[in-house]
Amino acid sequence: ALVGPSGMILADGTPVQFPAHAKPVLTGPSGIVFSNGQNIQLH
């Protein structure tokens, strides 16, 4: 995966856009939790 300040590209090529004004605070193998409480489930 490639991770940048505004999003990431997963190993399979799927782009993930991070929520505006939120930073990833917890990253694990199955998802990401952001500073605003939103979470993204990874494949």
From Swiss-Prot:
Sequence repeats lie at residues 1-18, 25-42. InterPro entries: Cuticle_1. Calcified shell. The keyword tRNA-binding does not apply. Keywords: Cuticle, Repeat. GO terms for molecular function: structural constituent of cuticle. This is Cuticle protein CP434.
